A protein has these predicted regions:
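N-terminal beta1-alpha1-beta2 module of alpha/beta enzyme domains
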Residues: 1-63
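Flexible, glycine-rich active-site loops centered on histidine and acidic residues
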Residues: 3-16, 78-102
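Hydrophobic residues within beta-strands of alpha/beta enzymes
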Residues: 33, 69, 100-102
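Glycine-rich "substrate-gating" loop/helix at the edge of Rossmann-like oxidoreductase active sites
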Residues: 45-47, 74-79
Length: 102
């Protein structure tokens, strides 16, 4: 059975939180870590910060070695398909290939 984790990253998840979470996932039986790709809180909380989804995934790819990473969706309303493709390919190269889910 695949065990994966999804986090609503736009709800004030800091880089330190992402890093600790990815390390904990990689040390456990969790195969993949997914995050939402939203710029604003879906809970209507404007004060909540949000790191960019693909920048976060690329950074996590650099500090993990087995954890699969990705988003559930990436809205084309603010991510042009060619820019999204470039972001995903970049993350895949940083990950060493084969760990990025789209």
């Amino acid at each position: 059975m695949r065990v994966c984790l999804m986090i609503e990253g736009q709800e004030s998840v800091s880089w330190e939180d992402w890093l600790a979470l990815a390390k904990a996932c990689e040390a456990s039986e969790i195969e993949a870590l997914f995050r939402s790709d939203h710029y604003l809180s879906v809970m209507g909380r404007a004060e909540r910060s949000s790191l960019d989804a693909w920048a976060t995934i690329s950074a996590l790819a650099a500090v993990t070695s087995t954890l699969r990473l990705g988003t559930l969706v990436s809205p084309v309303t603010f991510r042009h398909p060619s820019v999204l493709a470039k972001n995903v390919v970049t993350a895949d190269h940083i990950a060493g290939g084969g760990r990025i889910e789209l």
